[in-house]
Amino acid sequence: MSSFDPSLSTSGMRPPLASATAPSMADSLPSINFGFEELRSRMAQFTAQFDAFIERGRKQVLEERNQFKIGLAELQEDERMRQRDIEILNLKSQTHEQTLQKEAAEAAEMHAAVSSVTLERDSRLTKRDRLKQQIEETQKAINQKLEAQRSHSRYLDAQARLNVPELEFWQDYLCLRIEGAGREDRLKFVYSHLLEKDWEAEAWFELGTSSRDYEVFHSRPKLDREYLDRELDILNEDRDFGAFLKRMRRLFIEALK
């Protein structure tokens, strides 16, 4: 710091006082709008829409699952009835076989009745075969319906994962992409451009959405559980999903350093 020079304090060296109407240096600075309010608004809007999307998807999956269970119960009841028919048929068949044996023992004395009994037996065997064929066809139809239900459930799961509104903003803002995790109640969030020395390095975590409170099941690189639980507690309390994604990105950056 330079020392004070008394000669510079004389009125002759003092610059004239600034006019009251002269513009200040602060007035001449450019106005900067950082857009924090807009960003906060968009983050809140995204969080609300994301929660609504998760809730709608959960309700839809639960509704389809309930419908599937109802349909499955009906099919199982049909199968049970068919099984009972089979048991009745087997019982009738056993009774019939006993009748045939008795009639065969009397064949010498009742040769004339053998033809009639044989025809009756053949008729019943034909009827039994026809019933067996009907049972097989019914079982095949049940299996087809079950497969159709499973296929429909898989289709709904795929649609729910693909229908992700308002995520382009976060993908661009946080270098983030969202993928399916192989289950209907999980999403996989993948970050990139985390380190300046290696922009291709990626980090990800799987988020469970089956209940109101979110849960992280897996992450790579592995994050400290205490830090994860702290972030999840904040998210489940304030429901600010955008802020949670930003905090998770910071955790991965620290883990990769």
UniProtKB/Swiss-Prot annotation:
Which taxonomic lineage is given here?
Eukaryota, Fungi, Dikarya, Ascomycota, Pezizomycotina
User: Region Disordered: what ranges?
Assistant: 1-24
Q: Where do Polar residues bias regions lie?
A: 1-12
Functional note: Acts as a component of the essential kinetochore-associated NDC80 complex, which is required for chromosome segregation and spindle checkpoint activity.
- The region annotated as signal peptide is none
Question: What are the GO BP annotations of this UniProt entry?
Answer: cell division; chromosome segregation
Listed name of the protein: Probable kinetochore protein spc25
Q: InterPro entries in the record, alphabetically?
A: Spc25 (IPR045143), Spc25_C (IPR013255)
One GO cellular component this record assigns the protein to is: nucleus
Where does this protein have coiled-coil stretches?
58-151
Q: Which organism's genome codes for this protein?
A: Emericella nidulans (strain FGSC A4 / ATCC 38163 / CBS 112.46 / NRRL 194 / M139)
Q: Where does the record say this protein resides?
A: Nucleus; Chromosome, Centromere, Kinetochore
Which gene produces this protein? spc25
